Amino acid sequence: MRDYLKFYINGAWVDPVTPKTLEVINPATEAVAGRIAMGSAADVDKAVAAARAAFDGWSQSSLAERIALFERLIAEYKKRYADMAAAITEEMGAPAALAQKAQAGSGIGHLQAALAVLKNYRFEQPLGTTMVVKEPIGVCGLITPWNWPVNQIACKVAPALAVGCTMV
């Protein structure tokens, strides 16, 4: 059994404000796969404050910096692909083949799609004597379901990062 009892906030693994845990049950075996920390409103506030502070710098990052980040993310994802699939199998009880081919594959697919769009995206578009500028909006709050965990996270995180937003 593995325990994931910290949150990654402001570049560091931190303890939750209130130490409360939840068991993760593998629905295929009904075995406890691990425990996770449960967040509170205070934890969310800390994460939002950190994301807001990071927004000022990230929103001003260059296209080249964002492309480089996505290239590094994709390379790291490929290195950990088997681990991702194994975690999906364990935490949601998905058959290994489904976790490997569909679940883990969809996550990297969203990163690759965002990178492809980012390389050709026009953040500035002249229209006659006017310039339309598309800018990052701020901190994005991303709520994802459990049934396609990597897919639902990646399809929200990838575009947010690509356009210069931070997220919680």
Model regions and ranges:
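Short, structured beta/alpha segment
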Residues: 1-90, 112-113
